[in-house]
Amino acid sequence: MIKPLINLTGGLAAALLVASTHAVPLKQEDLSVAEVLRDRALESSDAYSLVESLTVEVGPRRAGTKGDERAVAWAQEKMKSLGFDRVYTEQIDVMRWARGHAHAEVVAPFPQPLVVSSLGYGAATPEGGITAEIIEFDDVEALLKAPARKVKGKIAFINKRMERARTGEGYGPAVQGRSKGMRAAAEKGAAALLLRSVGTDSDRFAHTGMMSLDGVENPVPALALSAPDANLLEAMLKRGKPVEVKLNVHNERLADGPSFNVIGEVVGREKPEEVVLIGAHLDSWDEGTGALDDGAGVAIVMETARLIAELPQRPRRTLRVVLFGAEEIGLVGAKQYVEAHASDLDKIVMVSESDFGAGKIWRFDTRIPEGKFAIADQMMQLLAPLGIERGNNKSSGGPDSSVFVARGVPAMGLYQDGTDYFDYHHTPNDTLDKVKPENLRQNVAAWVVMSFLATEMEETFGRVPAEQ
């Protein structure tokens, strides 16, 4: 009990008193402490200071690069300074790649330059580049269905627009072209792939990102076009004349190398072996500074742990913050973490991740057994005043967290407003000025409520069905 922290007023105090008269899994004093933590978070700018530090002092940090090395060192130093009880790293193995110059231009019928970005781990063109005719497809499914004879030797252009949504639900359909397009183009004998950027903006920035490389024997160059340049190609093609594009791309695959998951713990006072795991990913793409993806998430979970570590006593269970490495190239850090700790996953009480930018949180989802909904209902008493509504019980907890959920670990998700997230996602425009300090404060307030109460609840969630 931490009664000196408790300062309740009016309606909330009454609500907590009513809750305490029923058989509920969270004690009134724990809810009271969570309220104080929430209100402290709303008054603090420390999360913004963290993301400012990361973007200014480290900057881009693609897995396996010098920036990644600096980020790992930065994270360890910050965790120690924030009062974590244990700070350590676990090595992971990552593919490495060097991005070189990428140039694209229309050479006929209307010569003009195009703004492009190589997709992650994309191949280079032959010396001197390639020039070929464009063939357009509405989506990757159309490319997959096309006869190889129509595609061979041409540059396949996937012209799929992404729909804007608060939930980001337009990303799934649109990203199929990025993940599957290069493989499809290579199998059809295309000279290269051009992809309308997977984004919702109309800025002249291209959106990079990872693509599937598995089983591709002869990869072809693959580049994202900015939305205005995709519109330009579309307009040229409508004029009924063949459109020829020249590409000159200099990328290089490097030998595999190490990266790291960075882990910090606030060790539990009663049940240190039981773990509430909250995370974000430390790596970013290399053309912006990764402020939204995922610098904000890194700051949110680190600040959450700092607030809990400053309490007069440690939480009942261990709070573990994992800053996953190499998320952007395929959830590598999370996958290797789960494999390395497979025998201990039953000790993880709950997992959650912040990896959707820095918008305000508007919804609280779970993936817990139905018999445990009372815990989430009690958490909602303190989340609702932040403008957060109760969602569904289908949460993955976040991209990295989904790897844990697939093994039966319960999850919770605090979902941010993603209306404009994909305007900046994976672009040079993902920079600190897009992060609003007031939104970060609201995020941390929600995270500290959820995380603290998960460490203090009387009972655990048990397991959820593992996914095959």
Predicted regions: what they are:
Residues 24-36, 52, 56-155, 160-167:
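Noncatalytic luminal/extracellular "stalk/propeptide" segments of secretory-pathway proteins
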Residues 306, 310, 422-468:
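His/Asp/Glu-rich mid-to-C-terminal helical/loop segments that flank catalytic regions of hydrolases
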Residues 25-65, 205-213, 283, 354-359, ...:
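N-terminal capping segment at the start of a domain
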Residues 111-113, 132, 220-225, 230-231, ...:
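Metal-dependent peptidase/peptidase-like ectodomains
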Residues 49, 307-332:
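Short helix-loop-beta-strand segments that form the rim/entrance of peptidase-like active sites
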Residues 18-20:
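N-terminal signal peptide c-region/cleavage motif recognized by signal peptidases
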Residues 31-33, 108-110, 115-148, 211-291, ...:
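Soluble metallo-hydrolase cores and metallopeptidase-like ectodomains found primarily
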Residues 65, 115-221, 289, 390:
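Extracellular/luminal Protease-associated
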